[in-house]
């Protein structure tokens, strides 16, 4: 009986510890490419961290596809960031579907599975997009890292200051964005020291028992609300 009680208590303690684990997800927009994406993958490999890459269909070619395949093979998730990075609320329903299908089909061609998540270009939304895109919508906490005048130090400061359990970070691996590569290299050991574990966005939602909802765009998976068109 004592052994049974001890076993039950051990399971409960392990379950509690797991549920209280602080998780964050790094995600990167605007690849793939053969420069910055490669540098980012090297940094993630150095720190043994998995992340999510939201790719633009028009950026996938024979060479950049090899980088995307590397990312997938190293345990990162490949997600959808549209075909052309257009402001999608200006598009028709058919054009929206085409933007998504083009990229999803290319990702499936090269890595063997279709994206499950979608990040809208410019985080521009309307109801037509929700009605015609059968993927989970993802936003994220940014650090203005698309602006070249934002230094690596400023990016590090912003990323560290916004850290909290359940957060998705929205960063960029477009060509020439080396300051974000530097920032990520610096913030990972700091956040690990603070008790955070890095996972992909899919894994974040899985471990936090989040079932994707319609008409929701996720930044903090533990604090969500329905999107409403203004």
Q: Where is each model-derived feature located?
A:
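Terminal accessory/targeting
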Residues: 1-26, 38, 42-51, 164-230
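Active-site beta->alpha N-cap acidic-glycine motif
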Residues: 20-87, 95-96, 102, 106, ...
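A broad, low-specificity signal for short, low-complexity segments enriched in glycine/proline
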Residues: 39-40, 79, 99, 129-134, ...
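Catalytic domains of cell-wall/extracellular-matrix polysaccharide-remodeling enzymes
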Residues: 62, 73, 86-192, 196-197, ...
């Amino acid at each position: 009986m004592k052994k049974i009680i001890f076993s039950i208590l051990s399971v409960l303690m392990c379950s509690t510890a797991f549920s209280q684990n602080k998780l964050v997800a790094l995600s990167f927009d605007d690849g793939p490419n053969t420069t910055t994406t490669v540098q980012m993958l090297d940094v993630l490999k150095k720190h043994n961290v998995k992340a999510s890459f939201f790719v633009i269909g028009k950026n996938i070619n024979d060479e950049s596809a090899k980088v995307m395949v590397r990312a997938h093979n190293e345990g990162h998730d490949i997600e959808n960031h549209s075909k052309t990075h257009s402001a999608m609320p200006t598009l028709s329903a058919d054009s929206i579907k085409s933007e998504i299908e083009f990229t999803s089909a290319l990702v499936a061609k090269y890595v063997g599975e279709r994206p499950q998540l979608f990040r809208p270009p410019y985080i521009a939304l309307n109801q037509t997009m929700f009605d015609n895109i059968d993927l989970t919508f993802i936003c994220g906490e940014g650090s203005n890292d698309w602006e070249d005048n934002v230094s690596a130090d400023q990016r590090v400061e912003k990323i560290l200051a916004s850290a909290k359990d359940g957060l998705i970070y929205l960063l960029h691996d477009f060509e020439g964005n080396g300051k974000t590569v530097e920032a990520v290299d610096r913030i990972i050991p700091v956040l690990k020291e603070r008790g955070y574990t890095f996972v992909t966005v899919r894994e974040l939602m899985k471990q936090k028992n989040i079932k994707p909802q319609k008409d929701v765009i996720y930044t903090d998976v533990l604090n969500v609300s329905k999107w409403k068109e203004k």
